[in-house]
Amino acid sequence: MAATIDEELKKAFTELQAKVIDTQQKARLADLQIDQLTKVQKHARLTQTEMASLPDNTRLYEGVGRMFILRSKEEINNHLTDAQKTADEKVKELEQKKVYLERSVKEAEDNIREMLMARRAQ
């Protein structure tokens, strides 16, 4: 009977280790994505502040791939605002995902601790 419990603990530890590694990778990926989205937000904010100092009749071009398209100041400003909003929403989603991942690992660790306590009580 002790061998079965030891096997169960060993299996649980193996599963926990795999889950922790997977979760750490996902959390690292989320951090990288958050960093990238933060850069997008800063770039859009900087571009908007630079555009604000320009006169309204200034010809503005937006880079699309390998070409530039003539756009109005308002169109570019709207595009930058949308990009900031989208990036902000994605950052919030990624933050929530990270919290969920961390919570799930903590719950798994708590379950293992409970198994160990139950084993010691026997």
UniProtKB/Swiss-Prot annotation:
Signal peptide: none
GO molecular function: protein folding chaperone; unfolded protein binding
Keyword Chaperone tagged: yes
InterPro entries reported for this sequence: PFD_beta-like (IPR002777), Prefoldin (IPR009053)
GO cellular component, one term: cytoplasm
Keywords noted in UniProt: Chaperone
Pfam families reported in the protein's UniProt record: Prefoldin_2
Gene3D superfamilies noted in UniProt: 1.10.287.370
UniProt key word Chaperone: yes
CDD domains: Prefoldin_1
UniProt cross-references to SUPFAM superfamilies, sorted A to Z: Prefoldin (SSF46579)
PANTHER family assigned: PREFOLDIN SUBUNIT 1, PREFOLDIN SUBUNIT 1-RELATED
Role played: Binds specifically to cytosolic chaperonin (c-CPN) and transfers target proteins to it. Binds to nascent polypeptide chain and promotes folding in an environment in which there are many competing pathways for nonnative proteins.
Similarity comment text for this entry: Belongs to the prefoldin subunit beta family.
Record text on subunit structure and interactions: Heterohexamer of two PFD-alpha type and four PFD-beta type subunits.
Protein name as it appears in the record: Prefoldin subunit 1
Organism field: Tetraodon nigroviridis (Spotted green pufferfish)
